[in-house]
From Swiss-Prot:
Keywords, comma-separated and alphabetical: Chaperone, Cytoplasm
Gene name in the database record: AHSP
Assigned protein family: Belongs to the AHSP family.
UniProt-recorded name of the protein: Alpha-hemoglobin-stabilizing protein
GO biological process, one term: erythrocyte differentiation
Subunit structure: Monomer. Forms a heterodimer with free alpha-hemoglobin. Does not bind beta-hemoglobin nor alpha(2)beta(2) hemoglobin A.
Superkingdom, taxonomy of origin: Eukaryota
Length: 92
């Protein structure tokens, strides 16, 4: 089942905003631990999921599919961000 356009637009907006949040992060000393950063990023993902979940439209299965796609996209962005953070920690 394809996502309805409203949900596609909402997911796209959320992904852009999340990416902006990640790109605004400045790594500096003293750095927090990798585990702490993972916790922070997981909290951000949960915040975005909960915020956008309330705005999804359509039948429940359409909302669930949109939410699953959104979560996958946020997790992909998070993994890339955390890789950059790990590299920062190694170079410090």
């Amino acid at each position: 089942m394809a996502l309805i356009q409203t949900n596609k637009d909402l997911i796209s907006k959320g992904i852009k905003e999340f990416n902006i949040l990640l790109n605004q992060q400045v790594f500096s000393d003293p750095a927090i631990s990798e585990e702490a950063m993972v916790t922070v990023v997981n909290d951000w993902v949960s915040f975005y999921i909960n915020y956008y979940k309330k705005q999804l439209s359509g039948e429940q299965d359409e909302q669930d599919k949109a939410l699953q796609e959104f979560r996958q996209e946020l997790n992909t962005l998070s993994a890339s961000f955390l890789d950059k953070y790990r590299n920062f920690l190694k170079s410090s």
